Amino acid sequence: RATGHEWLILSGVGCPAPWPIDKVHRFSAGDSELAVFFRDDVRSNRISFRKTTPQEFIDDLSAVGGNNDAYVVTAMDAETFGHHITRWEREFLGAAFELLTHQHRRGANRVQMAFPSQLVDHFPAGETLVPYASSWSTSNDDLAANDPFPLWQAPGNTLHALQWEYVDHCQDLAATARRYASTPEAKKFAAIATEKLEPGLHSCQFWWASRRPMWDVSMIHRGLSLLNEVALNAARAIAFGGASPRTKQEARWRVAAANDTRQAIERVLMEEAAP
């Protein structure tokens, strides 16, 4: 709530309570609570993988809740429409909107679109709960195997482990750079490191390293290259900043460890065969 957010959407597989269609659960966030919506993974994936038609989708929604008010949350990547599936923004989204408009003109208002904030106002609060760690690509089998993020941080995936080790090094260096950026030169390089860190954490690099069966050396290396810039600029900021000699020495050790990890990642990318 400190950032102005009032609700969030999580994967349906992360719901630890009876499936909500007529109440909105809450999630404890520090001293306050956020409304939490759980994505209907089945219905959402039917759209994402072109397993439904606009008419089938709307007919299915019409039956939810019987005669009572109920809601369904569908969510997917925006690039699903037009990028992953050519013309899907017209063949599905546009067609679904036209069907709804036609139904409403005939006085059939059973299915309506709504913003999440409208649902928070319309439906009563449910339980305050702790969702399971999960993602939109997590299955119940993954949760049972204690693998909540199989495409991004899978147990047993050596490359994932190396990638996150490198992330830890870069985040530590960037934080140290900001903390001791007491000169104009140090502030300049600390700002560059901070600016590069956010895109450097993009999830595609881990997704393409998942081997389920996704594998793309160039996409993995693109993320590594962005993080390299974080480490480089953070190291320069620390060198020109006001840190103590001991802190600067520890930063040099951290850079050396980061270089070892980076080289290990590059060896995997150069030498290991695709799955």
Predicted regions and their residues:
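Active-site and substrate-binding clefts of carbohydrate-active enzymes
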Residues: 23-34, 38-41, 52-56, 62-275
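Acidic, His- and aromatic-enriched active-site or binding-groove loops in soluble protein domains
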Residues: 1-21, 26-36
